[in-house]
C-alpha cells in the first residue's frame, strides 16, 4: 500500500515539475492592463511606463525576434520576415511522412519494372 502512495507521489511530481519551475506571483503585483499602443511619432519616457511594459520593451530591444511595439512591425510581412509563414507550416506538416512508418519499418512493396525476366531479387538488368 505504501509503495502505491510513493509511486503516485513520484508520478504527480513528474507531471507537475514543469509548473513548479515557474515563480508564483502575488495577484496584487500582477497588472492586468492592456499593452500600450505607441504611435511612431510619439516619444516614450521610461518613467511613464509600468514595470511590465518596461520589461516587454527591454526584451524586445534585446533581440528576441519579436516584432517591435515601438517601430510598429506588427504585420503579416513582419511575421514572414521573422521566419513564420502559416501556410508553409501547414504544408510541411501535411506533406511530412508519418513518423510511425520510420519506427515500424513499413516499406513500399517492390514492383517489377516492365516485362524484364532478367531480374535477380530486386535488381533488374
Curated annotation (Swiss-Prot):
Subcellular location: Secreted
InterPro entries cross-referenced by the UniProt entry: Urotensin_II (IPR001483)
Keyword tags: Cleavage on pair of basic residues, Disulfide bond, Hormone, Secreted, Signal
Gene Ontology terms: biological process: blood vessel diameter maintenance; regulation of blood pressure
Disulfide-bonded cysteines: 119-124
Keyword set includes Secreted: yes
UniProt GO cellular component terms: extracellular region
Leader sequence segment: 1-21
Pfam families: Urotensin_II
The protein's name in its UniProt record: Prepro-urotensin II-beta
Gene this chain is encoded by: uts2b
Role: Urotensin is found in the teleost caudal neurosecretory system. It has a suggested role in osmoregulation and as a corticotropin-releasing factor.
